[in-house]
Amino acid sequence: IDLEFVAVTHLHSGHVGGLETLLDDGDITIGKIYLKPFIGTNLAQWDKCVHDGDALYQSLNKKAQSMNIPVIDCVPDEPFALGNWALRFFNTEPDSYHKNICENDNSFALLAEQGCRRILLAGDMINDTGDLVRLANAVGRVDALKVPCHGERAVPQEALDKLRPDTLIITNRLAEISDDVLVGIMSAFGRRAYSTSDSGGIALT
């Protein structure tokens, strides 16, 4: 299996933990890794203690360098091609100015487009500093949305009104999804919603 790249949305173990397993698998090759630099000076103390993003960053960098896999810490914000798809990262700059944030504020999102099809993978992006609203305004209408932050945090109505996805993917158990998310996304739009715990692995075709 050849992976052209792996994108690490942010430095929380739930989004990074499986990468070393991929790196250790001799049947998988990775062309490069997109990973924003870790900036801990403005992170809330609880986030540093619970997740230790600095250790994750150092470990991944060391492992990748030992395997001669480039780590791209200046994540591009211009569209680029992957086969027949056009991809674009959003929220690519580390947040170095807001105070007492969590690492989710540094999560980037990935928009994939092919013809009229548009899929938004929103990582763990939250709206504490307005990121989700800015993202929705920049992206507009999508066909499918990987719901940010596992559905545990509410998505602002302003963002939902812009995105209006037909299909929603939630990487969580439905029982752990925020009531605000269930009401704001599933009920308001009556769209198809799938959770990985109930549906298993999910592939968009």
Model region roles, listed by residue range:
Residues 10-15, 50, 151-155, 174-179:
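Acidic, metal-coordinating catalytic cores used for nucleic-acid/nucleotide bond scission
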Residues 32, 40-88, 101-104, 167-205:
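Binuclear metal-ion centers of metallo-dependent hydrolases, dominated by the metallo-beta-lactamase
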Residues 1-39, 135-152, 164-168:
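Active-site metal-binding motif and surrounding structural segment of the metallo-beta-lactamase
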Residues 18-22, 131-135, 155-163, 180-185:
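A short acidic, amphipathic alpha-helical/loop segment
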Residues 1, 65-141, 200-205:
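Core dinuclear metal-dependent hydrolase active-site scaffold
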Residues 10-11, 38, 76, 92-94, ...:
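Active-site metal-binding loops of divalent metal-dependent hydrolases
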Residues 16, 43, 120:
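Short acidic, gly/pro-rich beta-turn/loop elements at beta-sheet edges
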